Amino acid sequence: MKKCNLTENNTRYKHLIMQITGTHFNYYLICHRKLWLFANGIQMEHTSDAVYEGKLIHETSYDRRSDKYREIEMNGIKIDYFEPRNRIVHEIKKSDKRSEAHQWQLKYYLYVLEQNGVKECTGLLEYPRLHKTEEVLLTTPDRDAIREMVVAIKTIINNDVCPPKLPRSKCKNCSYFDFCHSGEE
């Protein structure tokens, strides 16, 4: 069994994670271990076919969109497409199923925009494989929940020991699967 401890080599990452990114937020809702590993410098996404496939879907599903909309990077978030005129944030997901983590990641983007003076935005989660679009709004209870989640994320990230792994059945398509489950039958 692999034991994950924060070593001297990667303690430098703890001080860099002052801003929570959309990825941190998404991983928090999916797997605390994945969040901890990612935030502490163990990043497996570059070797993941699923991540590569998601990037391709993002780049090819809506080719004409880049003419009208903008990709935005701000305070640790990276928005796929922003429609300035209507204040709509578009987030594209490769998944063949909807996820609460997807909704909260988009709500977090809306929250960060709001904190930076871009008010009254709405979000659209787009699932090209499903041919579905889902509207996402940010409510007052959502804002409170986001503030609580940010504290919880920072607590996990700054812990010296990573959280336990989830059961194999929940990890099949995870880019960290081999890291967490290698050597198991």
For every predicted segment, state its role.
Residues M74-K78, R85-R87, A101-W104, V118:
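Short connector loops at helix/strand junctions that flank enzyme active sites
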